[in-house]
C-alpha cells in the first residue's frame, strides 16, 4: 500500500458487472508511464473518474490540455474525448473508476440529472482542499477495504 490519503494497491481492481450492463462499476488501481501514453484521445459509453495519486500528469479533454496535480479528480461523462499523458520517468499511480447507472429508475430522474452536473463542466477537473478530499476519499477507502474482506 502507498502512504497517501487514498488507499492503493498496485494492479488491484474491483469489478461489478460489465460495461454493457445497466449497473456497472470498475475500480482500477494501477500505474501508467510515458512509455505507454495513449496515442489518441478516446471515449467510452460510461462515466469515468480519474484520480492522479502521483505528482503530475496532463489530461487532454476535447482537445483542451490541462495540467494535473496530485489528487486532482477528473470527471468524464460518456462519449467525452480524452486522454492522459504522463511525463518521462517512473510510472505514475492513479485510480480510475468507470461506472454506469440505470437512467430509468422511477422517481430519480431529477436526482440523476443533478448528481452528474459536475461531469458536464467545460473543464471537469477538481482540486479539493484536504477536508473536502477526505470526504470524497473516505467512501473510496471503505470500498477498497471492504473489497479485501
Residue ranges and their predicted role:
Residues 1-30, 81-148:
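A hydrophobic/aromatic-rich effector-binding and dimerization subdomain
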Residues 1-69, 73, 88:
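Generic protein-terminus/edge-of-domain signal
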Residues 56-58, 74, 78-84, 104:
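Histidine-centered metal-chelating micro-motifs
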Amino acid at each position: 500500500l502507498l502512504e497517501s490519503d487514498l488507499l492503493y494497491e498496485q494492479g488491484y481492481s474491483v469489478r461489478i458487472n460489465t460495461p454493457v450492463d445497466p449497473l456497472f462499476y470498475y475500480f482500477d488501481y494501477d500505474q501508467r508511464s510515458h512509455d505507454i501514453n495513449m496515442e489518441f484521445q478516446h471515449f467510452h459509453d460510461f462515466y469515468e473518474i480519474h484520480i492522479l495519486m502521483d505528482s503530475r500528469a496532463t489530461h487532454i479533454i476535447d482537445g483542451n490540455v490541462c495540467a494535473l496535480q496530485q489528487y486532482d479528480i477528473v470527471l468524464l461523462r460518456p462519449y467525452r474525448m480524452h486522454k492522459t499523458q504522463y511525463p518521462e520517468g517512473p510510472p505514475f499511480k492513479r485510480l480510475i473508476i468507470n461506472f454506469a447507472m440505470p437512467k430509468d429508475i422511477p422517481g430519480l430522474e431529477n436526482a440523476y440529472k443533478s448528481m452528474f452536473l459536475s461531469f458536464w463542466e467545460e473543464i471537469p477537473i477538481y482540486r479539493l482542499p484536504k477536508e473536502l478530499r477526505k470526504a470524497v476519499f473516505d467512501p473510496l477507502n471503505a470500498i477498497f477495504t471492504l473489497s479485501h474482506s
